[in-house]
Amino acid sequence: MTITPEIKQRVTQLRQQLQKANYAYYVLDDPIMEDAVYDQLYRELDSLEKEHPQLITPDSPTQRVGDQPASQFVSVTHNIPLYSLENAFNLEELKAWEKRWQRSYEKEEFTSVEYVCELKIDGSALALTYENGLFVRGVTRGDGTTGEEITQNVRTIRSIPLKLNIDNPPPIVEVRGEAFLPLDEFDRINQEREEKGDALFANPRNAAAGTLRQLDPKIVDQRRLQFFAYTLHLEEAEISSQWESLNYLENSGFLVNPHRKLCQFLDEVEAYFKQWETARKDLPYMTDGVVVKINNYSLQKALGFTQKFPRWAIALKYPAEEAPTLVKNIVVNVGRTGAVTPMAVMEPVHLAGTTVQKATLHNSDRIAQLDIRVGDTVIIRKAGEIIPEVVRVLKELRPPNTQPYEMPDRCPECDSPLIRPSGEAVIRCMNLSCEAILRGSLVHWASRDALDIRGLGEKIVVLLIENGLVNSIADLYYLTPETIANLERMGSKSADNLIKAIEGSKQQPFSRVLYGLGIRYVGSVTANLLVENFPSIDQLSQASFASLSSVYGVGEEIAQSIIDWFSIEKNCDLIKQLKKVGLQLETTSSEQITVEPSLTPFSGKTFVITGTLPTLTRNEAKALIEQAGGKVTGSVSKKTDYLLVGEKAGSKLTQAEKLGINQLSEADLLRLLNSE
């Protein structure tokens, strides 16, 4: 059919009118067109494009929702990595962050520093790419280096422009931001799911993440996600600050959080945080803190990055939420190291955006300290809005005839005697054949930071064990699609994918294999340090206590743990089996592992420990600190950076207070370690 100039002009007019209406409605929240008029114009444009498909452009409003579902998502490497942010859980930690960056870069031109404050939106981070002003790619954050391309789904988000609203756009524009579900939309979706008998989403963040990974973009479109842009990357652009970037994004057609603020001093940042700590309850979306960034790009560049975080930004998290609930039962779980951890099973309670039914009680000492009993009303808290814990018992509400809880003396999984090793706060099952230990070891082996075997979660691990298919980590590598296809929830396609993932894990580097073995105290950072100094499993297994403990960041506790692990015959047999099936148990020429001491969390920091800690022994705390690059001494002095304080602290606490030394609780220590 012939395309007349009048038709071309009409299509262009319709497209421009609809784009303006979309921007006014979804970004400015100021509608300029009645719904009926919008629908009429949309139908006219859609009809003209169907009659003349050569007139369709990628930025047309009709092209937001694709017709065909995706078969799968493809992993892609980010052009620019998406870093995590360091967390601060109180204003003192915010001040400490400022002192850290000031110490690391002292130059006159940055004596006056501005900070940009933005609400930290509780959603899913996305990376967007525009070429010559047109949206071409949307990718999930993933692990920060690689993510999944979900371009079709991202196109459905109306607050993301398909074409930048600027003249002469740069050839490449990279935008970062957060996709989220408004609270009213979250409630609507859950109401519909409840009516259909589907499982409810726990919180808006989970709902947003699950929505973005839908294969059918029509489902994504129905859920009405929103997007706040917060980072801009341009090549050779004359933009010198974060504040200018946010304005550029807004002028380009993006929705930028309207509550951002440019602060001249840290006192203003604190006031902003306190304001939104209260006012956030009135927002139409979830926010879990405030992101604070140094405004000046030159200073940002000078400060640079750690392994995981930009030094020029920090996330100041809101205080943990607390709520009362009833303890229905106390159960114990056996972990992969044999540690037996008591858990409180409670009446469901809504806390920090999720429904909580269980909370850790850590160990028998903590239970005795709390005097917690079945039937008690307790206050629970989500530290950092992640880990539920019982903080106190409301004994005035305790019903009569409750009994003190006693920890079991035999393993609930294998009935072996439980032992409390000398100097430890936890009791352990020492039976290496215990099914719970095997289950935990397999799940750890398959985890993202270890061998990263996709599809091998706890449910599949349980099925493999129950069906007698796996009795050790090495057994995974003898599985075939035929042997697992008949397992519950499996099927031939899933079986093929799982076996491919297991086979693919043979290419994971030695450092990941070492971490996956689950040697006590050997985290991913320590595994890298060990591999750098002992490039093969044979060298590591034969290393002396002196050579191990002399490695920076290892220390005596970790060294002894490694020696103990290799002294067990069953573990040595496992290494032989892993060699046989082809795992990487030595470094290759292409594998370069460098872990700078300056990049470890507590590098150069001196700690002193005083009092009795709630869950850790002094040796355990010391090992964790040393593993993170710190040093533990026996006395407080001006050179002490932190005092780790437990109950019944002695004169060291008094001395630290006189010297103005920072004090940490065990919870503070663990939060700092986890945030790294």
From Swiss-Prot:
EC number(s) per entry: 6.5.1.2
One GO BP: DNA replication
All residue ranges annotated as the BRCT domain in the record: 597-676
Cofactor(s) the protein needs: Mg(2+); Mn(2+)
Protein residues bound to NAD(+): 35-39, 84-85, 118, 141, 178, 293, 317
GO CC, alphabetical: cytosol
Pfam families: BRCT, DNA_ligase_aden, DNA_ligase_OB, DNA_ligase_ZBD, HHH_2, HHH_5, Nlig-Ia
Residues that coordinate or bind Zn(2+): 411, 414, 429, 434
Matches recorded under InterPro entries: BRCT_dom, BRCT_dom_sf, DisA/LigA_HHH, DNA_ligase, DNA_ligase_AS, DNAligase_adenylation, DNAligase_N, Hlx-hairpin-Hlx_DNA-bd_motif
Record's function text: DNA ligase that catalyzes the formation of phosphodiester linkages between 5'-phosphoryl and 3'-hydroxyl groups in double-stranded DNA using NAD as a coenzyme and as the energy source for the reaction. It is essential for DNA replication and repair of damaged DNA.
Name of the protein this chain belongs to: DNA ligase
Organism (species): Crocosphaera subtropica (strain ATCC 51142 / BH68)
Gene name in the database record: ligA
